[in-house]
Regions:
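ATP-dependent helicase/translocase motor core
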Residues: 1-142, 146, 150-162, 186, ...
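Signature of the SF2 helicase/ATPase Hel1-core->accessory helical subdomain module
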Residues: 1-3, 7, 197-205, 211-264
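Conserved beta-strand scaffold positions in the cores of enzyme catalytic domains, especially
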Residues: 105, 192, 246-248
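A generic local structural motif
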Residues: 126-127, 169-177, 203-207, 232-235
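Hydrophobic positions in the central parallel beta-sheet of the AAA+
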Residues: 140, 191-193, 218
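Conserved helicase motor
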Residues: 145, 165-177, 195-200
Length: 264
């Protein structure tokens, strides 16, 4: 990005407004003026006009939090802003879909906010497919009941309407409903699926015919773990809907045959 020259008078005025004139000649301040410092490059690349508009539209979430105040539990809405790795991942996914990809792996380290990324993706990809006259339906796949409960809490705290599927029957009931939304609230929805209890189910998955304007999107959490995709329910599920989008999230992108990331 082209950088404009710093107006020295404006610089002095800004420092004066914050009562920070004394730092002007310090070595640390002069270093921070460099355009190639890591922090400056991240901030300026994130705040380019296109990306800043993207953050304003998709990158703000209000998370319901509870805290104790004077012995009472109060509920507040805490504003969360999309982190840089979440923004770059969302932009990359959208670009890859535009280039014709239908699957891919997002490699984000532990603590980078993969569940929050999935929340943002429900809005980013819903808009992406709306422009194609298609309706996106989201499934978040985990492999333990505690992860299902954790993801459900995280999504609900951010305002998503969450359905859960702990058994094959529950998931098939979800698939038989060809509507993009299960409820009537009009809020964004996601289905959280615990694959653990029926991962070894090798029975062929029969999906009912559905309108061509419905786009299923599967997001797999911790995809480096042993989902055992070969000849199991997960593989059969993907085969039953070849037009679905598969996004694997992992901090350890192993490509062994027993990991979901190898299939995606």
């Amino acid at each position: 990005y082209p950088y404009k020259e710093i107006n020295q008078e404006e610089e002095k005025q800004i420092l004066a407004d914050f009562n920070c004139q004394v730092i002007h000649h310090t070595p640390e301040y002069q270093t921070n003026l460099g355009i190639n410092t890591p922090t400056n490059r991240i901030l300026t690349s994130m705040c380019s006009p296109e990306r800043l508009l993207f953050i304003i539209k998709y990158g703000i979430a209000y998370v319901k939090m509870e805290k104790e105040v004077d012995g009472k539990i109060e509920s507040t809405d805490q504003k969360h802003i999309m982190r840089y790795q979440q923004m770059f991942a969302a932009l990359a996914i959208r670009q890859q879909l535009s280039d014709g990809a239908t699957s891919g792996v997002v490699w984000h380290t532990q603590g980078s906010g993969k569940t929050a990324l999935s929340f943002y993706l429900t809005y980013v990809l819903s808009d992406y497919y709306a422009k194609k006259n298609m309706v996106a339906k989201f499934y978040f796949i985990v492999d333990r009941i505690d992860l299902l409960e954790q993801a459900t809490q995280e999504f609900e705290a951010r305002g998503l309407v969450v359905s859960t599927a702990n058994t094959r029957a529950e998931l098939m009931a979800q698939f038989r409903n060809n509507h993009a939304q299960e409820g009537t609230s009009g809020q964004q929805e996601i289905t959280v699926v615990n694959i653990q209890r029926f991962a070894e189910d090798k029975q062929k998955v029969e999906l009912p015919a559905y309108a061509t304007n419905l786009q299923r999107i599967f997001i797999m959490d911790e995809a480096h773990r042993g989902y055992k995709p070969g000849g199991c329910f997960l593989a059969n599920l993907f085969d039953a809907d070849p037009s679905s989008i598969k996004i694997a999230l992992t901090g350890t992108p192993l490509l062994k045959k027993d990991c979901a990331s190898s299939v995606v």
